[in-house]
Amino acid sequence: RLAAVGEQRDAQRTVQLAEGSIVNLNAFSRVDIRIDDAQRDIKLPRGEATFKVSPDPARPFRVRTPGAVVEAVGTQFNVYARPDGTTSVTVLEGKVKVTSDHGGSALPVPLAAGEEAQVLANGRIEREAHTDVAEAVVWQQRKLIFKRTSLEDMAAEFNRYNKKTRIRLEGI
């Protein structure tokens, strides 16, 4: 089965997949879902989603962004395919493996609950232990938190959520 979900600027959606997993999709995000007897494959070409994965060791659950592949069996994690080509992965419960999808023979990086990794546009994976997982999913409460973020990136993130009020930077 193949299905596409998402693309609305100001709407978050929760989707329960036929095999029991739950996808919380952020605003202006899209997932393409392919589930069959051999695989559970989710493409996240743009945006952000939290996945609560039903255990099924025979069919690993894979989320593919333009720059990374995240694999889980039964866990909960957040993935954000950023506009700059970086993919952020935060593990809320359980464990996942993160692999760069930029070619080469990069080994998977294991992450456990409370850990985060950034897969950079050049394929390098930067791992951060003991992250604040609540901040990774604050978008589900329709809130934004910025740390070490340029004003331009903050405006772009705000505009992703809001179609009535837009921020435009001039002369900066």
Segments predicted by a language model, with ranges:
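A residue-level detector for the "anchor" residue at the start of short, highly conserved motifs
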Residues: 1-172
